[in-house]
Amino acid sequence: MEVSNLPTLQDIPLPWQQDIWRSLTARLAAAKLPHALLISGEAGLGKTLLATAFARLALCRSPVGDKACGSCTSCSQFAAGTHADFNRIELEERDGKAGEDGQLKSAISVEQIRDLIGSLLLSSSRQGGRKVALIEPAELMSISAANSLLKTLEEPPADTLLLLVTAAPGRLPATVRSRCQSVALAAPATAVALDWLNARQRREDWPTLLGFCGGAPLAALDVAATGIEERRKAFFTALARLRSGEANPVLLAVHPKDAYPELLKLLWSFVSDLILIQSAGTRAPLVNRDQLPLLQKAAEGINLRSLYAYLDRIQAAIQALDTSANRELAFSVLLSDWATGLEELNNAPLAAHTAWGWT
């Protein structure tokens, strides 16, 4: 069943964004906004919606309370994507080479940032208010682009607001981060997220989907709409077949390029559940509780140290997704490790696991 009632700008702030929204709008009303905000948080928390709604409010000529009016000339132009004082910088499409139609470039270019700076510096506000720029995903600015933006962050034009949106603030240069005021979104309490999800569609599997998505409600909505349940069960069955020698890891690793983020996330949730079973037993809060018999069997004969080391490798593969030239090979290596029962990882060095998690 397709999920309906996806959030829009009219729904902002979402329940878990209300405190941040109140703080931002109060500073806007008091004319105490910094020149640049770094809005961060994991995927699926509505960062871009929040930033876009705030940009619209900052440009609105007749705000109603802490919301944009939606009917003034500024709001009408914003909705139409024609507001002369609003710039959105995002990944551009590739240049149409064979097999690349519709695909996005891997980085925000220095040319895009230079064009933005030119717009901010060389022209005054067309409507007599402020100028707003939204850069997303900010962590994908090239080094040259980030360096080009730095001068503007150090000496911002008057009446200009820069909104940098990112799911990975650590990938931005420290010099850029230090010149922005941080606005960090956190995942809501599970009860809050489930109430919000069930208000849009009643589903018994929301707890599983929410856990799979690291507690991010919009990500849970997204995966629910893609029919992930059948793919999840099929993938876990394939992992069981790998352990029993009934499947070939090289063949199982062959997928379309855009499938690997989901597959790695599934593998991460599978292994993290095995760690919970090994360390806390079957009453632990498992993401994939509906697959408990399969998980219990998978946990047999594998020690906790090996599972932690394997989780480190999965996390490294996740973090390398944007730069990995051969996702299939990297995924094949992970599946081969699993097929051998993680034997080579028994004495592997471990990263710190005081706060490991999906990012």
Go through the PLM ranges and name each one.
Residues M1-L57, G65, L121, A158-L161, ...:
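Charged, glycine-rich active-site and insertion segments that engage polyanionic ligands
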Residues M1-S144:
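Clamp-loader machinery-focused feature within the broader ASCE/P-loop NTPase space
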Residues S71-S74, D85, S119, P137, ...:
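Residue-level recognition of specific faces of alpha-helices
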Residues A80-T82, P156, V176:
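Short, structurally constrained coil/turn elements
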Residues V132-E136, L149, T160-T166:
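Structural recognition of the conserved hydrophobic beta-strand(s) that form the central parallel beta-sheet
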Residues E136-S142, N147-E154, G170:
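Catalytic acidic motif of RecA-like/P-loop NTPases
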